[in-house]
């Protein structure tokens, strides 16, 4: 079952057909930072997308060399020097029905500009709890409604982002970033099994600490651990590392 790359054709913007599984939420994406017209950590994004696609049964038949070539071609075509590129993989067109499967997945690349935010982040706690057993939280799926609602709530009360907790009241992640805290010169971050997306920057930071014999632990964290921490920060592929200023104004 192949993967079809939908490319620009003249002035026409590539799009998914109305019968595509993506309109039922069956799709994945990767957001890749572009520096000096080069995609950052392209292999890690390709690898994660492939692993996630296999979990969902979405065909992802594209080699890393082809993936990288498509990224470069799109970046060059859009004259992007600094910015981002989004790769969206859909389940493909299929017959009507929740359990139906597309036979040919579809992949679109979109470039965009963005600004790096340098100010510290003000967080709020979201008042509903996540089920850590829900497999969706470990996938970068196109189903972002929960994050949209949460971030709008945060902005409405003057915060920057929202922090989720699971049904055991353990910290998970924000709407778009992984969380770390520092306590007694030890770096801590929530476990993937607590219901988080295994972020690319998160993985790089953990690997960097391990390579340089710096103490880093993946454990379940409570809100009090955040409040008592020496420092708290967030990571994601576009913004890098951002310090957390407060959680619920504390």
Across the structure, where does each feature detected by a protein language model lie?
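Short secondary-structure junctions
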Residues: 76-83, 214
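Ordered, amphipathic secondary-structure segments that act as subunit-interaction surfaces
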Residues: 80-91, 96
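Helix-start/capping segments and mature chain N-termini
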Residues: 1-73, 90, 98-250
